[in-house]
């Protein structure tokens, strides 16, 4: 039996006339009568009978009204429970990230979310050479992406872009380097240096391009590596200098130091990319909020350390 027709029968039992039911439900009296006739056919027995100038419910009709009431209660209860469930941050959330983004944020985020009932955060990392991390949003709930500036294509594609943090990028030098005594460097200081570079069009490589533009001469790039750990080892070993992210570069007691660079834009913006529909899920919202909080704490801790 159709729930909507059962509801019409309930309305008839409460309002007394087909006309009153029609007024309450916004349909014509003939439409109400037609639906009640269909319900009688489904029930296999008369549900109404003539009563004066109107109609009244039969014994079967009154019994079915009781059943309809029980069904309506069950539907309301189910909808209420579903509404409560949808407000809870439960279920699986998939996240993918570039390597250093995961290194900075994921251990702390996972630790904070481990005790949330019913929530499971599943994380993976991606090849940093991926042309556009936005291409991953159909396959993951949250995509962590880095860029010198937020790419216009992200919003052009209808994605929700949540800024998490802006990380400075520094010049990494061997401890014995001639520039090690300086507290801040300029592009002119770096003219003629040997570089350990990143793949073309990485955020680090774009800063090297800006240094080239300021100095008016090409940079001398001896090697290029995707992995920052290899770059750190090469710099510490005296093979050249490099652009590296401030928050994940290991520059304590390993033969490597970092210095800020003035005169060019030296930072990368880190954002969470999502399809708008997935961003509506409470579980996804909780993960993103936790990412934001951890990113803010990380940036604040480095600011305090620098101060």
Roles of regions detected by a PLM:
Residues 155-169, 173-195:
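Flexible hinge/capping segments at coil-to-helix
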Residues 92-151:
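Central regulatory/effector-binding core of bacterial HTH transcription factors
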Residues 12-28:
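Short helix-boundary/capping micro-motifs
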Residues 42-43, 64-86:
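Alpha-helical linker/hinge and terminal dimerization helices associated
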Residues 40-57:
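A short LG(V/I)-centered, amphipathic sequence patch enriched
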Residues 157-160, 229-277:
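Beta-alpha-beta core module
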């Amino acid at each position: 039996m159709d729930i909507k027709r059962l509801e019409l029968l309930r309305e008839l039992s409460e309002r007394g006339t087909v006309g009153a039911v029609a007024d309450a439900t916004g349909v014509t009296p003939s439409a109400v009568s037609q639906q009640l006739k269909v319900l009688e056919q489904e029930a296999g027995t008369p549900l109404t009978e003539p009563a004066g100038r109107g109609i009244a419910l039969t014994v079967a009709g009154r019994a079915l009204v009781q059943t309809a009431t029980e069904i309506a209660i069950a539907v309301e209860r189910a909808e209420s429970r579903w509404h409560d469930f949808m407000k809870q941050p439960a279920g699986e959330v998939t996240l993918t990230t570039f390597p250093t983004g995961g290194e900075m944020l994921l251990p702390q985020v996972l630790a904070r979310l481990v005790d949330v009932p019913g929530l499971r955060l599943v994380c993976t990392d991606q090849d940093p050479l991926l042309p556009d991390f936005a291409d991953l949003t159909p396959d993951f709930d949250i995509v962590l992406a880095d860029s010198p500036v937020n790419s216009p294509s992200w919003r052009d594609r209808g994605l929700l872009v949540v800024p998490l943090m802006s990380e400075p990028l520094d010049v990494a030098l061997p401890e014995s380097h001639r520039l090690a005594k300086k507290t801040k460097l300029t592009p002119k200081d770096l003219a003629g240096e040997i570089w350990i570079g990143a793949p073309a069009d990485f955020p680090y490589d774009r800063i090297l391009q800006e240094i080239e533009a300021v100095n008016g001469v090409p940079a001398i790039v001896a090697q290029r590596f995707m992995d920052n750990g290899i770059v750190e080892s090469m710099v510490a070993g005296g093979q050249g200098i490099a652009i590296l992210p401030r928050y994940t570069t290991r520059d304590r007691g390993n033969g490597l130091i970092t210095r800020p660079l003035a005169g060019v834009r030296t930072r990368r913006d880190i954002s969470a990319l999502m399809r708008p529909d997935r961003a509506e899920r409470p579980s996804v919202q909780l993960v993103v909020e936790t990412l934001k909080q951890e990113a803010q704490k990380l940036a604040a801790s480095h600011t305090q350390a620098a101060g």
